[in-house]
Amino acid sequence: MKTGTATTRRRLLAVLIALALPGAAVALLAEPSATGASDPCAASEVARTVGSVAKSMGDYLDSHPETNQVMTAVLQQQVGPGSVASLKAHFEANPKVASDLHALSQPLTDLSTRCSLPISGLQAIGLMQAVQGARR
């Protein structure tokens, strides 16, 4: 595995976990359900969903080197309109990639909706860039 790919995966996982932490905190403070059924918003379920999405996206990026390079370059840019424009241009030129990544992130989107977690794609990119900037 290339060092850049491993680093990108670690950053993506760190960002996804950071995005899920507020929801995990809420889930931990929430009262258990009366039925005793597994809580889909419990911290353990949030972590499983985040991990699953991160693994799927990492595998996808490994198998799509051009998209991996674009995403890596975006992580190295300053947070702002330029980085969003770079991604938008890539996705407009490659609608299948946009559709694939949307489908891969759908479990996280569903979790966000179901558990009222404020997670969006742009927030994830911004946090990934912030992590990248903090490590320089």
From Swiss-Prot:
GO cellular component terms, A-Z: extracellular region
Effect of residue 60 to F/H: Decrease in heme binding
Residues annotated as signal peptide: 1-27
Documented effect of changing residue 60 to A: Does not bind heme
Residues reported to bind heme: 60, 64, 90
Record text on subunit structure and interactions: Dimer of dimers.
Protein name: Heme-binding protein Rv0203
Organism: Mycobacterium tuberculosis (strain ATCC 25618 / H37Rv)
